[in-house]
Amino acid sequence: MHHDAGPLRIEELDAVRGFALCGMLVVNIWRITDIAATDESGVVLPIRHTLSVVFEGRFFPIFSFLFGIGFALLLDSAEERSERPRLVLIRRLLALGVIGLVHQQFQPGEALLPYALAGLAILLPAAALPNWAVLLAGLVGTFGVALALGGGLALAPGLFLLGLATARAGIVDTLDERGWQIAAVFALALPAAIVAGRWEYRTPYLELWSTPAVAVAGLLGALAYVTGLLLLLRIEPGQVLAEVLRPLGRLALTNYVGATALILLAAPRLGLSGSGSYAAVLGLAVGIIAVQAVCSAVWLRLFEYGPLEWVWRCVTWWTVVPIRRTRVPSRPY
């Protein structure tokens, strides 16, 4: 079985990944800078509560779901190209774990190391299961955790499985033919996300993580964001946005780690660490996204992979992969 992802399909996934990366950066930057969430009297700042409803919990599920899709595509590629496909997957996850371990020294709470561990513990065994079982486990894992634990990183394994099941069901292969289905999901997800977002906003900020409000609103918001973006990418104005997001998505690993370095370098010099200036912190986030978008686009004119993506790929296939750009389209995994 081989999912040969066509140009439109992979470009759409890259754009969605780039979109998720931007949203995660906004959330990560206020965590890294430790920006104040309350005023001097201990009352939560309205802007923090509003930004939480717009950003927090919305982009992490997208990234996790895409991780499961990527695992499925890599598995297909490994089965085609290697006599020991599971060893290929193990190397990829171990390499990600090492990168995550180093990254965690600078950004505690980062996602790469948990992704690698969950991939080894859950995705690898799940790859041997029938797809209906993977889908069922993904649904139970995602929504069960959302209701019982209130979300967070615990949602990742279920979302991994949903991504794996989606790719194995052939939906990724036929994404460009599913415009009406995407529109139907968006039409249902958007009002549901708005209702859930109002529920989250009306829940006292300091009580959010003891209720399922964040997880439920986050999952519905993520679904509305993704389907809305996919619809936007199919019309002419969306192509401009796609040109910005795709390079960011192709270099997602490099940009995710690189953003941490840029935040740690810039925040103290700009006096943002521990401050209450959300405008300045959000301005820094926009600046980092702009710099990374330009650098990613320029880099991809010369090279096939980002720096960390290239290292990751070399370890995955246990060979030195050519990095210079050629006329022959590269494989996504």
Model feature map: region roles:
Residues 2-333:
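Alpha-helical transmembrane segments and their immediate juxtamembrane cytosolic regions
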